Swiss-Prot record:
GO terms for biological process: RNA splicing. CDD domains: Mago_nashi. One of its GO terms (cellular component) is exon-exon junction complex. Its main location: nucleus. Belongs to the mago nashi family. InterPro entries: Mago_nashi (IPR004023), Mago_nashi_sf (IPR036605). Keywords: Nucleus. It is found in: Nucleus. This is Protein mago nashi homolog. SUPFAM superfamilies: Mago nashi protein. It comes from Euphorbia lagascae.
Length: 149
């Protein structure tokens, strides 16, 4: 189905283990067009939310555009803060014949970014993750909350 030039996969995870157990948000865009979303919060005994939806090629193309314009594929996480007790973030991307994987701590604000050893690279990561989360939340909300008239 997918050739080397149009191969696309993305996985994002952010989470921590605390007094409410393992709490996390994870989503992935798969090569077959499936978007998988999971959100686990045990706060007040919440249950895990899992959603799956198939996306059109136009939506996947927009996701690829967001990633390409961010230039995240040129970055390196060697000087980013490592995962700690606050939590961890992971971003894995395959676009064409390029593959990149990042692991860093949870980022609370731009102040954390500015204090890092690589503020430029981490800023790109921070804003890309923000854009991707907004994109995914919009897609999931549109797909599952629209009520027929």
């Amino acid at each position: 189905m997918a050739t080397e030039d149009n191969e696309f996969y993305l996985r994002y995870y952010v989470g921590h283990k605390g007094k409410f157990g393992h709490e996390f948000l994870e989503f992935e865009f798969r090569p077959d067009g499936k978007l998988r979303y999971a959100n686990n919060s045990n706060y007040k005994n919440d249950t895990m939310i899992r959603k799956e939806v198939f996306l059109t090629p136009a939506v996947l193309k927009e996701c690829r555009r967001i990633i390409a314009e961010s230039e995240i594929m040129k970055e390196d996480d060697a000087n980013w803060p490592g995962p700690d007790r606050v939590g961890r973030q992971e971003l894995e991307i395959v676009m064409g014949n390029e593959y990149i994987s990042f692991t860093t701590s949870k980022i609370g604000s731009l102040v954390d970014v500015q204090r890092s050893k690589d503020p430029e690279g981490l800023r790109i990561f921070y804003y890309l993750v923000h854009d991707l989360k907004c994109f995914v939340f919009s897609l999931i909300s549109l797909h599952f909350k629209i009520k027929p008239i």
